[in-house]
């Protein structure tokens, strides 16, 4: 039995002004989980609460979720959920707020569970006994509004991706107007994060016809429209294209899963940068490493983008160059060293990072099976900005 699947939310609502769809969502008590201030500052929170009031839905707000949501924040939010007893959970804002809300949801429905109990992939028990989940993203990056993943940071700064189709939201509301206030650096970092999702999904060992179609279109759209959204954040067409492209990427990787680009990025705990920026700096080295077994797949991506090359090897080189050029156009450094990561700290910890990355859930679907030494070499190539030759 060659069993494959494609699982996404029941409802994906998209287009300018679709935040108003909240008025059609059924419920009596809504728990709104959000970040620190941006949703208040841009007026989105007022719109959300206004629509809930029109529907006679009571609500409470849990705010202050940090950029890399911690286990402690998740536990604190889960306690607030238990006190309020909602039947709707709204993840509002960037991926951190939505990911944190997903994890809180688990502990709200299963108060006796601890983080260690749900770290293994697909170990979360059935949800929706107490509440349904609505995701409203304000950035065009992770696609978490349609994915089975929530990235939570443990002590020591190590990011751990929780993975279960139970935490795939029930409703995703994609309103590009919410993204108009995103500053250029956030637009860039979230956009290249989405690109890393599509690139990894396409070469994953679990890729299929559904995920391939979404990944390719996402990659092409991001290359065309991310620079435009970066240059002019008020361009609603560019914002719409990017919001849909990152959503395609999310649906693709939620079903095909990811690879070592994410495994390596998850484990660098001493670097002060965004997840998306780290992903895209690592990506050229990852592609070069994986191309020894997945060269044809990367070549197909390059052809879809119209890049030059008469052989798989040449097409892979064109793809790597295109990613580097995109990064440069977005003001993203070419290496981890250029990013400012301390060299002594990196060299001291590279083996520790590599060992942790080897055990990351994303490594299991990488097209090339790595060793710890392989991953160290990929880290070093990304740190110094040289080519991978192994």
Describe each PLM feature range.
Residues 206-214, 229-241, 256-261, 313-316, ...:
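Flexible, glycine/charged-enriched surface loops at secondary-structure junctions
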Residues 256-319, 324:
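C-terminal catalytic subdomain
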Residues 10, 16-17, 34-36, 65, ...:
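Fold-independent oxyanion-binding glycine-rich loops
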Residues 1-88, 336:
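ATP/NTP phosphate-donor binding region
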Residues 72-177:
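Glycine/threonine-rich beta-strand-loop-alpha-helix active-site module
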Residues 149-256:
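Carboxylate- and glycine-rich phosphate/diphosphate-binding segment that chelates Mg2+/Mn2+
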Residues 302, 308-390:
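C-terminal charged capping/lid subdomain of soluble metabolic enzymes
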């Amino acid at each position: 039995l060659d069993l494959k699947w494609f699982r996404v939310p029941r409802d994906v609502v998209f287009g300018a002004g679709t935040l108003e769809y909240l008025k059609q969502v059924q419920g009596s008590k809504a728990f709104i989980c959000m970040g620190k201030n941006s949703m208040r500052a841009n007026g989105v929170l007022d719109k959300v609460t206004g629509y809930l009031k029109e529907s006679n839905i009571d609500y409470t707000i849990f705010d202050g979720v940090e950029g890399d949501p911690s286990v402690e924040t998740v536990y604190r939010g889960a306690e607030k959920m238990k006190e309020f007893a909602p039947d709707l959970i709204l993840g509002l804002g960037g991926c951190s707020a939505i990911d944190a809300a997903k994890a809180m949801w688990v502990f709200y429905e299963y108060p006796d569970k601890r983080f260690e109990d749900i770290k293994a992939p697909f170990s979360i028990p059935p949800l929706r006994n107490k509440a349904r989940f609505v995701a409203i993203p304000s950035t065009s990056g992770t696609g978490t509004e349609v994915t089975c993943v929530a990235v939570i940071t443990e002590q020591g700064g190590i990011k751990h991706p929780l993975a279960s189709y139970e935490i795939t939201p029930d409703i995703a509301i994609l309103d590009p107007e919410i993204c108009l206030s995103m500053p250029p650096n956030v637009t860039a970092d979230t956009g290249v994060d989405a690109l890393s999702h599509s690139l990894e999904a396409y070469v994953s060992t679990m890729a299929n016809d559904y995920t391939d179609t979404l990944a390719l279109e996402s990659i092409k759209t991001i290359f065309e429209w991310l620079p435009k959204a970066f240059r002019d954040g008020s361009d609603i067409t560019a914002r719409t294209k990017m919001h849909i492209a990152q959503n395609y990427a999310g649906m693709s990787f939620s079903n095909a899963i990811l690879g070592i680009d994410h495994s390596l990025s998850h484990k660098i705990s001493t670097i002060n940068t965004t997840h998306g920026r780290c992903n895209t700096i690592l990506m050229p080295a990852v592609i070069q490493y994986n191309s020894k077994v997945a060269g044809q797949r990367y070549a197909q991506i390059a052809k879809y983008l119209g890049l030059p090359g008469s052989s798989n090897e040449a097409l892979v080189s064109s793809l790597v160059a295109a990613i580097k050029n995109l990064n440069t156009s977005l003001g993203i450094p070419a290496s981890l060293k250029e990013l400012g990561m301390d060299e002594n700290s990196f060299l001291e910890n590279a083996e520790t990072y590599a060992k942790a990355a080897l055990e990351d859930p994303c490594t299991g679907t990488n097209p090339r099976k790595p060793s710890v030494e392989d991953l160290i070499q990929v880290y070093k190539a990304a740190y110094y900005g040289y080519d991978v030759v192994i």
